[in-house]
Structures are given as C-alpha cells and as structure tokens.
Amino acid sequence: MDCKYLKECGSCTLFTSYSEQISFKTDLIKQNFSHFYDGKFDLFSSSPKHYRTRAEFGIWHEGSKLSYTMHASEKGKKVFIDECPKVCEQISHLMPRLLESLQDDEILRTKLFGVEFIACKSGTLVTLLYHKKLDSEFEAAMKILASKLDVMILARSRGQKLLSGELNLVDELNVDGQIYKFSLSENAFIQPNKAVNEKMIAWAKECVQSGADLLELYCGHGNFTIPLSFKFKNVLATEISKSSIANALKNCELNGVENIKFLRMDADELMSAFAGVREFNRLKDIKLSDFNFSHVLVDPPRAGLSESVINFIRNFKNIIYISCNPETLKENLNELTKSHKVIKFALFDQFANTHHIECGVLLEAKR
C-alpha cells in the first residue's frame, strides 16, 4: 500500500507486500492451530487499501489551521495526516472537504478534538467531538455544514448530543448474491471491512448444510443472525446492548425475517435460564424447551469465552466460533476440542497492513 505516512503512523504495523502479509498470517495461524486441525485452511483476503468503512481521527489546532492526527508508531507521539489510504473512497473524498469547511467556521472548529466517520449505503455519518457546550448558534452552523457536504452530522460534548437532522444509517451487504439491509445506530459495533464481512457471513452459511434451530450469543444488530436465519427453522439470539437489540428487531423487518427471537440477556443469564435455576420476565413469551438447537454461533469479544460459556456450548452438536483474537481462540479450543473436533477453519484478513487476524472455526461433537 502506498502511504506517505507509512512507518511514521502507528495504524499500520506490516510494511511488506500484501501477498507477503497474507503468507505471514497464514503460516502463523497454521503453526498455532495445526494440532487442532490438519485440513485445508480457508483464506479470505482483503483489498490492501480503501477497505475501512469506519474511521476515527484526532484533531490538532495550530491557530485557525486544523489537522487530522493519528497515534504515531513512536509511543506517546502523534502524526499529522491529510489522508489515509485505508479508509473507503466515500470517507477519503470527504476528509479534505470536511477539514476545509471546519477551518473556515470558527464556531465549528473551536474546541473540536476528534472526528469519526461511518460510511454506508444511505450516506455518511460524521461525528464531531467537542470540549465545550453546544448551543443554538452551534447547532445552526452544524446544520448548514451537513447540508453543504450532504452528510449526517452528530456533535457530541459531555452530556450533550446534537443531530443535524434525521439519522438514517442503513447499509447493504451482498452475501452470495442475496442483499441484506441493516439499520445502524451511531454507536453500533460494525465490522469495518465490509467486503471481508460479507465473506465471513458467506463462510458461516457454508458451515450449515441443514439445521433445525440456531442459538446465537453476542448477536449485535444481527450481522450473522439475519443471513443465517434462512438456514434454520427458528433462531434464538442474545445480546446485552439495548440499542443493538433495537436495531436487530428493525433489521428483521427490513429483511422480512420472522423466525428470530431476540433476547436482551448476557451469557450467564441465558445459562441460568437453560438450567432452570432462575426465571426471567424477558422469557415469558419464549419457551426454551420448544427449540431443537442443532447449532450454536458465538462471536465473542477479544477476551474470548469464559469457562462457564465453554461448558454450556459443549451441549450443542455444532459450534460456529467467530474469533477476533487468535490467542483466546487457541485457549478456548484447548477446552472445546475435548468434546468436539474442528471440521473447518478459516482466516479472515479484516485489517490489511496490520498484524490483526480474525478466524472462523466449525466444530462438531465427537461421537
């Protein structure tokens, strides 16, 4: 990737050609997981540039001049940038226009310390972060800027949130030729590499030849849930975030899905419900014994699965595990492979030019 800040900016950590990066990551995964799996490792690569649909930058002030900043490779320092080849073209084209407009407006540039971008099918959301009170004069200036740049703007300060207008964040994913629509909130967790996300979902669908019912933990706004729902009779999906559950319900409507039950419940609560040791009002309309689960899907945070969750999902014949941290995946597989065997293993290069690796594993109960 051609970048004038390469090695100076701390965002990228691999500087070889993309083919060499892929070879390095593939070899690393094979070395660490070959004792779990001796079959073919599926590799899903990324475009080496313009792949990020979400980006965050600091803002540096020098008089009336503003600069985007990133953490430098040298600890404790910043690097001033005017472009980033990793961001998608939708964000890349907007970055200089936004900065110029902010510089020209004293109300909008004063006390601004950060900018965040989310690009999707319906448009771009720009979040402006401030160390000041946001008043009516500010709100008027923000709305003018949003109209000028044809974007949605969200301004945040401590205890304040102002929107330039209606928030309409809707993205589309193309998975095996099927279009899925997703409504997002400004604080939703989204996979920043859209193209690789589509490949991850397609791979997860391939893991299911035929299924009865699916249980999903950590479902978010339904990124995997909704495409996979067409492979199952019924789906029960859990998530702790209230806003994610709200988006997930909206996304069912957008995609005409009626066989998913979403529960705002963490993994420990769900396990208590399955064990019958605690009753939940949230389950008053859901009878767990009515489900015939053939698969469980987990997409945990970097910390991986707790011991109790591992013991719980051992009760399922098929486990689809999406991991954003190979280290905790390896720890979890040490336990899971006592009862299950690895059937498929995939590597997803979500973040080109970095050491980050995401994996997908299909496990099946040993007979």
UniProtKB/Swiss-Prot annotation:
Residues at which S-adenosyl-L-methionine binds: 191, 218, 223, 239, 299
Keyword S-adenosyl-L-methionine: yes
Coiled coil location: none
Domain of life: Bacteria
Cysteine-cysteine disulfides: none
Signal peptide: none
CDD domains: AdoMet_MTases
SUPFAM superfamilies listed in its UniProt record: S-adenosyl-L-methionine-dependent methyltransferases (SSF53335)
Active site (record annotation): 324 (nucleophile), 358 (proton acceptor)
PROSITE patterns the UniProt entry points to: SAM_MT_RNA_M5U (PS51687), TRMA_1 (PS01230)
InterPro entries: MeTrfase_TrmA_AS, SAM-dependent_MTases_sf, TrmA_MeTrfase, U5_MeTrfase_fam
UniProt-recorded Gene Ontology molecular function terms: rRNA binding; tRNA (uracil(54)-C5)-methyltransferase activity, S-adenosyl methionine-dependent; tRNA binding
Gene Ontology cellular component terms for the protein in this record: cytosol
Top-tier EC class: transferase
GO process annotations (BP): methylation; tRNA processing
Transmembrane feature ranges: none
UniProt key word Lipid metabolism: no
E.C. no: 2.1.1.-, 2.1.1.35
Reactions catalysed according to its record: uridine(54) in tRNA + S-adenosyl-L-methionine = 5-methyluridine(54) in tRNA + S-adenosyl-L-homocysteine + H(+); uridine(341) in tmRNA + S-adenosyl-L-methionine = 5-methyluridine(341) in tmRNA + S-adenosyl-L-homocysteine + H(+)
Keywords: Methyltransferase, S-adenosyl-L-methionine, Transferase, tRNA processing
Family listed: Belongs to the class I-like SAM-binding methyltransferase superfamily. RNA M5U methyltransferase family. TrmA subfamily.
HAMAP family registered for this protein in UniProt: RNA_methyltr_TrmA
Role: Dual-specificity methyltransferase that catalyzes the formation of 5-methyluridine at position 54 (m5U54) in all tRNAs, and that of position 341 (m5U341) in tmRNA (transfer-mRNA).
Name of protein: tRNA/tmRNA (uracil-C(5))-methyltransferase
